[in-house]
């Protein structure tokens, strides 16, 4: 999901 980039 796009949540993968939310880690930043």
From Swiss-Prot:
Subcellular localization(s) per the UniProt record: Secreted
Principal location: secreted
Residues found modified as Phenylalanine amide: 8
GO annotation, cellular component aspect: extracellular region
Keyword Secreted: yes
Any one of the GO BP annotations: neuropeptide signaling pathway
Keyword Kinase: no
Protein origin, superkingdom: Eukaryota
Keyword annotations from UniProtKB, A to Z: Amidation, Neuropeptide, Secreted
Note: Pericardial organs release this peptide with 100 mm potassium in the presence of calcium.
Family per similarity comment: Belongs to the FARP (FMRFamide related peptide) family.
Record-given protein name: FMRFamide-like neuropeptide 3
